[in-house]
């Protein structure tokens, strides 16, 4: 019995088979690793890759394209270079280096790629923003006019920092630079300022200590720590500050206030130099690449006070689409970069670069630190280019005489070492200066509210402490402020609310201080 095959049956079977056949083809742009080592990989074949784009290497190692050359791409690796070998396939990710942002990041310790490293589980952040972004143009900015209180008397009185300012903290190692930054973070409690602490090239133990300090003083709830430790690859250390700026910009552009601390940019410059030399970029002064100034300027220019006009703010240059619906005006991003000097040499390459970019510097000196003056701020070299605009009126009023008195004291102190016979006026100026220096001393992690600062500096500049023995000044200050808080809280709250020191309040404060000091001297007779 023969079976006949009908052509129409065959064609209908084929049609059914073809209808059920689905071809799934994923198209990837791939390249091949030509050479790898020291955290750098040279990749052949990625002809359409963008500068700053993330690349996927085998074994879950991520990289970033930095050098786009004629025949290959120079990429930096964010993982161990031993995990990547010659001939490996590299995939383009199609996305530029970015980081998750949002309130979910607060209270967490993350690496510069936004991955949590504190063991508290994954972060539920809906939004991702690119690490690199152009700074807001002039039209979208507003001049700095609100104070960002650090809680340190010497800074808030003489080197005030405003919201949206860039103020450099510079000094040798072990002079208390990080302590100043941490005090500033602790002082933002309840002030609606979100803080980002970027640790670049620090020891893991140091970062753990910083985190435990922030936890101890209830400051971690409004702070994010971005950590690139000394053992992390150089590329991670170099991108860490940009991650901090991006996170701060999210708060700034949504109409809130943020403070970002870069600790420290000297180590970032060193890691950038390492990456650049490995990528065979031509070296310049001190072997840094020619664009090391641009590295820091494009980072620090992102700190700004944004205009109050929402419509103008929404047109901000380089604003990511995902962020546009959330934009509000009036936000600010304040930057406190830290630079470590060698033997007090402020005129080295990186320190001079960053000094010229920032709106002032707080210079910490090891001699002052070792002599017991802490914070060890050299008031002569330190400056804030925003000045009185970043102070409340009461502080502005009394701080002018403070700076002058201290300058005269330093000058006379140098001369007094040569001769012992001093006239009455000179001796009085020296005595007052010594007491003012004593007033400006402050313990670590005890930031002082601005109204208390105003009260004690007013008492000092009025000469009311001149008759108090120098060794009792700190004790007198503590007891006086405690007494004010207990019996005359209205004066302190008045200064805090109005921001001014009216003539009647000033005379009342003077009377209270005079009576208190008289009884204090009686009580503490030697």
Curated annotation (Swiss-Prot):
Keyword list (alphabetical) reads: ATP synthesis, ATP-binding, Cell inner membrane, Cell membrane, CF(1), Hydrogen ion transport, Ion transport, Membrane, Nucleotide-binding, Translocase, Transport
| Residues holding ATP | 171-178
GO CC list: plasma membrane; proton-transporting ATP synthase complex
Catalytic activity as recorded in UniProt: ATP + H2O + 4 H(+)(in) = ADP + phosphate + 5 H(+)(out)
Report whether Electron transport shows up as a keyword of the record: no
Instruction: Give an example GO molecular function.
Output: proton-transporting ATP synthase activity, rotational mechanism
Where found, per UniProt? Cell inner membrane
Q: Which domain of life is it from?
A: Bacteria
Specify the protein's topology with respect to the membrane.
Peripheral membrane protein
Q: List the disulfide bonds.
A: none
Q: Where is this site: Required for activity?
A: 382
The answer on whether this UniProt entry bears the keyword Isomerase reads no
Pfam family, any one: ATP-synt_ab
Summary of subunit composition and partner proteins: F-type ATPases have 2 components, CF(1) - the catalytic core - and CF(0) - the membrane proton channel. CF(1) has five subunits: alpha(3), beta(3), gamma(1), delta(1), epsilon(1). CF(0) has four main subunits: a(1), b(1), b'(1) and c(9-12).
Q: Per its database record, what is this protein's job? A: Produces ATP from ADP in the presence of a proton gradient across the membrane. The alpha chain is a regulatory subunit.
Q: Which PANTHER family match?
A: ATP SYNTHASE SUBUNIT ALPHA, MITOCHONDRIAL
Q: What is this protein called?
A: ATP synthase subunit alpha
Organism, scientific name: Chlorobium chlorochromatii (strain CaD3)
């Amino acid at each position: 019995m023969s079976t006949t095959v009908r052509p129409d049956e065959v064609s209908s079977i084929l049609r059914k088979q073809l209808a059920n056949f689905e071809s799934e083809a994923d198209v990837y742009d791939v390249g091949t690793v030509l050479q790898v080592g020291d955290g750098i990989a040279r990749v052949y074949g990625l002809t359409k890759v963008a500068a700053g784009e993330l690349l996927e290497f085998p074994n879950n190692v991520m990289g970033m394209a930095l050098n786009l050359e004629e025949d290959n791409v120079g990429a930096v690796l964010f993982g161990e270079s031993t995990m990547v070998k010659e001939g490996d396939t590299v995939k383009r990710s199609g996305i530029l280096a970015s980081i998750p942002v949002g309130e979910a990041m607060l209270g967490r310790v993350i690496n510069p790629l936004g991955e949590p490293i504190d063991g508290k589980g994954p972060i539920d952040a809906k939004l991702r923003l690119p690490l690199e972004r152009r700074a807001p143009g002039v039209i979208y900015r507003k001049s700095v006019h609100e104070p960002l209180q650090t809680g340190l008397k010497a800074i808030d009185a003489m080197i005030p920092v405003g919201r949206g300012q860039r103020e450099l903290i510079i000094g040798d190692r072990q002079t208390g630079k990080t302590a100043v930054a941490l005090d500033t973070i602790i002082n933002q409690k309840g002030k609606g300022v979100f803080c980002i602490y970027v640790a670049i090239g620090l020891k893991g133990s140091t970062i753990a200590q910083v985190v435990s300090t922030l936890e101890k003083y209830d400051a971690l709830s409004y702070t994010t720590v971005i950590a690139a430790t000394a053992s992390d690859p150089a590329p991670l250390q170099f991108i860490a500050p940009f991650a901090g700026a991006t996170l701060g910009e999210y708060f700034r552009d949504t109409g809130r206030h943020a403070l970002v601390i870069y600790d420290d940019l000297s180590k970032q410059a060193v890691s950038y130099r390492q990456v650049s030399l490995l990528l065979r970029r031509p070296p310049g002064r001190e072997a840094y690449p020619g664009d090391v100034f641009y590295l820091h300027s494009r980072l620090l220019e992102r700190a700004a006070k944004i205009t109050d006009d929402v419509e103008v703010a929404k047109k901000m240059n380089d604003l990511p689409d995902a962020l546009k619906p959330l934009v509000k005006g009036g936000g600010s991003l304040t930057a406190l970069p830290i630079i470590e000097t060698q033997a007090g040499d402020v005129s080295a390459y990186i320190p001079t670069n960053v000094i010229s970019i920032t709106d002032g510097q707080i210079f910490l000196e090891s001699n002052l630190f070792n002599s017991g003056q802490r914070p060890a701020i050299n008031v002569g070299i330190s400056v804030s280019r925003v000045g009185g605009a970043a102070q409340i009126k009461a502080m502005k009023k009394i701080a002018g005489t403070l700076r002058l008195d201290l300058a005269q004291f330093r000058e006379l102190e140098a001369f007094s070492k040569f001769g012992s016979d001093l006239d009455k006026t000179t001796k009085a100026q020296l005595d007052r200066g010594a007491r003012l220096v004593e007033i400006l001393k402050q313990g670590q992690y005890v930031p002082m509210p601005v109204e208390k600062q105003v009260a004690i500096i007013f008492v000092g500049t009025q000469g009311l402490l001149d008759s108090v023995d120098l060794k009792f000044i700190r004790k007198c200050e503590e007891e006086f402020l405690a007494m004010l808080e207990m019996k005359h809280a209205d004066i302190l709250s008045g200064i805090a609310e109005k921001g001014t020191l009216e003539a009647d309040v000033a005379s009342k404060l003077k009377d209270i201080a005079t009576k208190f000091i008289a009884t204090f001297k009686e009580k503490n007779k030697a």
